[in-house]
Amino acid sequence: MTDEGRIYGRNPVLELLRSGGRRADEIAVLAGARGPLAEVVALARRAGVKVSFRTREQLTAIAGTDRHQGVVARVASAEYADLSGLLEIPKRRGEAPFFLALDQVQDPRNFGALLRTAEAFGAHGVIVPKHHQVGLTEAAARAAMGAVEYIAVARETNLVSALETLKKSGVWIYGSAVGEGSPAWTVDLTGPLCLVLGSEGEGLRPLVARTCDILLTIPMAGQVGSLNVGAAGAALCYEVARQRALGGKTA
């Protein structure tokens, strides 16, 4: 699921095939494949996907990078979910909504890591703005290590309007802040919620911050003043999962 219609790397391609979601048009594999690459070939053939064997140089030309790990998949262009579709996911599962919203995160590695984090800790979807925000690129898909095949991503023209729509559906909006707000583990995070993380350099934009019902902080014990957005997202998503597993017990 990338804008360019290609994904590469062993784990992303394996998860593409295991998920049974989007169909790959072709899997190009390094000739003489063994180990994980042999598993890719077996899964692709089982799914009826065309497999071709290429030299390393040919794979580099197809992927546009030499970091393909011996496999490149041609897939359909990215399809983003819509917000109403995201809201249906927790309803179908009978769970309290848990969404992650990103306010202009621009590094594809951070975006991919956050998609992986969100999926790992049980988020029902991720919401991003259309502008000044990295999309589902090859680099983001690689950083997500296959998580893009399992988690829905909605891309909205106006993030504030999207958050207001969530509020009308009974979802509380919790923003990540530095130096102000309540420590995350003192707040009950078991109800319907959306965590909002700001950009790498600026954090939450003022209007986005004002839209939040509560601002959360991650208390720091060391000398550094903050975490990057990927690390902060991991800490907060873990806290949501921890509280829900413990039935709402805060620190």
Where do the model's predicted regions map?
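N-terminal positively charged helical leader segments and presequences
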Residues: 1-89
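Structured adenosyl-cofactor binding patch, chiefly the S-adenosyl-L-methionine
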Residues: 14, 120, 142-147, 206-251
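RNA substrate-binding interface of SAM-dependent RNA methyltransferases
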Residues: 15-18, 22, 88-182
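Short, glycine/polar-rich helix-capping loops at beta-to-alpha or helix-loop-helix junctions
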Residues: 36, 133-139, 202-211
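Short beta->alpha connector loops at strand-helix junctions that form conserved
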Residues: 55, 76, 103, 129-130, ...
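Short basic, glycine-rich beta-strand/loop surfaces that mediate nucleic-acid
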Residues: 62-76, 144-147, 152-154, 190-198
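Active-site/ligand-binding-proximal alpha/beta "capping" segment
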Residues: 174-228
